[in-house]
Amino acid sequence: MTVRYKTARVILYREDRFLLAVHQSFWRTRDRRWGLPGGQIERGEAPAEAALRELREELYVRVPSVIEVGPFSYKSALHVVYAAPWHEEIRDFDDMELDEIGWFDEAAILSLKHERRLHAGWELEAVQTLRRLIGAARD
């Protein structure tokens, strides 16, 4: 059985920092919550392809591939998270999609979670899962 995901999200990472973004909120009040770049999976599109496309559209970033971190639930839907290393600065992004981007370490993401400033609430868990995957790959 094929799992149907609503969105594909991506953790860009470098050393001990992870990229989060504040998405535009035209349809509701701006609550300035930080989340992962990504978005809707189009009809007929593989989730990993959607993740790569969303990186190009939102951050003007091209990565050769992504690794799957796992599925996460938000508002009664499943969302799949991928990850890719990124070592360059991101100086520009689509300001029709995103308000702000920033690199955060795990402690800062934990603070955002305690302040209820994470979009879906599971971003920290996704980062921690990625760290375990990276650690296992090194062993």
Predicted regions and their residues:
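Conserved N-terminal beta-strand and adjoining loop/helix that marks the start
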Residues: M1-L20, Q40
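Charged phosphate-binding loop/patch that engages nucleotide di/tri-phosphates or the phosphate backbone
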Residues: L118-D139
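Residue-level signal for short segments within beta-strands and strand-turn junctions
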Residues: L12-R14, V22, P85-W86, D105
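Short secondary-structure boundary/capping segments
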Residues: T2, V10-I11, F26, P71-F72, ...
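Unchanged
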Residues: Q40-W122
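Conserved Nudix-box catalytic region and its N-terminal flanking loop in Nudix hydrolases
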Residues: R17-R53, E57
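A generic fold-level signal
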Residues: V3-Y5, Y13, T29, S76, ...
